[in-house]
Amino acid sequence: MGVSALLAALDEDLSEVEQAVALLAAAGVDDPESLSVGEGDRRLLELCRAVTRAGVEVVALCPACGELSEAVVSPEAVAPASPRMTPLGKGGGLREPTYRDLRELPAGPDEGTHELLARCVVGSPSRAAQPSDLELVDDSLAGPIVIACTACSEPIAVDVDVQRAVLERLAHRAQEIDHEVHLLASTYHWSLAEIDSLGDERRRTLAWLVAETR
């Protein structure tokens, strides 16, 4: 599937979880709703690099020296996904949520958390699951990471949400493709079908050449 067709799966009317599932399905992932959020985040990171040729860029201000530093979160920079479950006393435990577990949760934060816990309980545990137990099974790529300041080497803690960052980057790439299509259509009077037939690399190159001559 071409990049433009893949990015057509993005729909701003959908929630972030629904967009992530739609993208993974368009990329050929079988039953993406069954993926854990941690596995899904890592696949989204790989998808982002395949589409944009880059990982997720992180920029932060160093509190020690005041300089801006940047780093790239790439598939190789994160640990592989690992199934997680924490025991809840005897007889059962709590597993990591899947995308399916996150769909159509109650709107209220307390009610939503309670329902999510209920969906992720395995077996018949001797104690009830608590909201804090979710942290023990969280393998998602959301939360603080530490990068080194490029100026003074001091560590900088940066909050990163890979799912959100990937969706924003891919939405930006979709806008770039729309611009490429517009340039080629207005310059050569080609139809959308003709432009689509060029393929992603050729469309991108021709659009760049047109932009350079303007």
Label for each model-derived stretch:
Residues M1-R214:
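Long C-terminal interaction/binding lobes of large macromolecular proteins
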